[in-house]
């Protein structure tokens, strides 16, 4: 009985050990893929990446093949040598990233025999061009990546190799791109296919440069320079410059004199008398060293007053000194006294007469003494012209000021707004300094809001004034700008005519 009890104990013990061993040992399937195959498939599924897709511009369905294609190709080409040097780090990134995405839903890779592995590897389709997906625009999508299968050194079956089938991922700050394989031959194939699909030619930049060089354009097509980029100088008002200019353009339409007051209002005064008065006021401004804005405002007040008030020629000089007194009080730090203006007229008018005319002018103007003049716009336009100009800065500024002051003498130029006169003065000054170069460019057209064709008539009128020469009977302005402090710009030779192609707008 004791022997039977021992036998039963041994039988039960062996059966329990066998049952425990059977419970611990994984079951092997008929195809050779058991628990080990599922574990390998699970590891492979954890490393699966986005499926490769065709990114050729034809398949993408839009966009020029030049710019976008170039950007994509450069990223793919530059990523290749980086990947070869940091394959392990890239694989770790892919494993950690893919583990957070669904991996259980992927099917295990089918097991193949050792002698079939070489044949199946050769029959695998060549890899497609790596997809470059902007991470900010598209969310990553994971799909099974079962195109590459490599043999494993175990028994009669093989599974996905750890070093051959891992879909390595690399990341850059802006783009997420997907690549397969780690051999130099695969990388070379990817680059060749990318070049073929994207149709990128090495001569594209050369052809584009040649097209730009041979493009016919009467005006220089260039980029617009940023003039208002100095935010440290409070006098430039960089943040408000554009708004100030638009306000001045609107204000000049409201505070302009009539263009025909000599024909409709004045009976005893003609344009020649007006020119003589202004020429004399230029001498007065030089005598008292008044700023140019005072002279421009004086002429503005005179023309606005003459636009609505008839006056005889004996009081025209009185009107001139009264308007200059008002302008000096507005512009100058230390304006001349009334007695000085009486003295400058050789005491032709008494103090009370000057003050009476001053009150009459202010009442007619309704005390609206702030008016945009050509000098206001010229100061802005000179700065714009000097940003990308090779001409000497002072020569351009003085020559433009000289042309603008000549415009004060001409009654017919009242038909042009002050901003147009200032832009035309810049145009003519640049032409005089460089007769063979187009005076206008994109930067001037942008900031002045005038095309070269719009300046044609005014520029030609200023050109005639400039070409009169020193023989004119109104010499004050010319003598002023023949001084050394103004770089003798009044003596600059001027071509007899301006080419018509300079007044053609740019064609892009």
Swiss-Prot record:
GO terms for cellular component: cyclin-dependent protein kinase holoenzyme complex; cytoplasm; nucleus. The keyword Membrane does not apply. One of its GO terms (biological process) is cell division. Expressed in the dividing region of the root cap and root apex. Expressed in the intercalary meristem of internodes and in adventitious roots under submergence conditions. Coiled coil: none annotated. Residues 29-39 have a biased composition (Gly residues). Keywords: Cell cycle, Cell division, Cyclin, Mitosis. InterPro entries: Cyclin (IPR039361), Cyclin-like_dom (IPR013763), Cyclin-like_sf (IPR036915), Cyclin_A/B-like (IPR046965), Cyclin_C-dom (IPR004367), Cyclin_N (IPR006671), Cyclins_cyclin-box (IPR048258). The keyword Transmembrane does not apply. Residues 1-28, 98-111 have a biased composition (Low complexity). Residues 1-40, 82-125 are annotated as: Disordered. It holds the Pfam family Cyclin_N. CDD domains: CYCLIN_AtCycA-like_rpt2, CYCLIN_AtCycA_like_rpt1. Gene3D superfamilies: Cyclin-like (1.10.472.10). GO terms for molecular function: cyclin-dependent protein serine/threonine kinase regulator activity. Involved in the control of the cell cycle at the G2/M (mitosis) transition. PANTHER family: CYCLINS (PTHR10177). Belongs to the cyclin family. Cyclin AB subfamily. This is Cyclin-A1-1. The lineage of its organism: Eukaryota, Viridiplantae, Streptophyta, Embryophyta, Tracheophyta. The gene is CYCA1-1.
